[in-house]
């Protein structure tokens, strides 16, 4: 018996959420940073990761590539940008989807691009000037 068309997206969303929840313990903080524009540094302390960015010359944004970008449950990933008007553009180049199961914060705007997909889980929090 086929699912009605309106149930298919819900079924897909539930399947993705289940996959992320079961993989939650294996998820790691963002990794494999490559700076394309501006500057960025990463510091870790326990389950907290801080990414400090500065804008490209004459620009109001930084551009970063990541091999992987997920935020595990119980962890915090914080972007510190020059101002609330700054934007950090983050592109995932690896094959895995991004799962936001912990807390992702920024004093500025964040753009997260992942062709494999992005999911914010039930315990996931995104607190930014714009996402």
Stretch-by-stretch model annotation:
Residues 2-12, 16-131:
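Solvent-exposed adhesion/ligand-recognition segments of exported proteins
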């Amino acid at each position: 018996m086929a699912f009605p068309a309106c149930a298919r997206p819900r079924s897909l969303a539930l399947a993705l959420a289940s996959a992320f929840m079961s993989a939650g313990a294996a998820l790691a903080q963002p990794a494999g940073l490559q700076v394309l524009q501006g500057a960025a540094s990463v510091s870790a302390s326990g389950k907290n990761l801080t990414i400090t960015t500065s804008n490209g010359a004459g620009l109001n944004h930084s551009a970063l590539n990541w091999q992987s970008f997920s935020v595990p449950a119980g962890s915090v990933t914080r972007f510190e940008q020059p101002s609330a008007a700054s934007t950090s553009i983050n592109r995932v180049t690896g094959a895995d989807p991004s799962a936001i199961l912990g807390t992702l914060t920024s004093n500025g705007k964040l753009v997260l691009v992942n062709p494999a997909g992005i999911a914010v889980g039930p315990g996931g929090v995104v607190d930014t000037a714009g996402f």
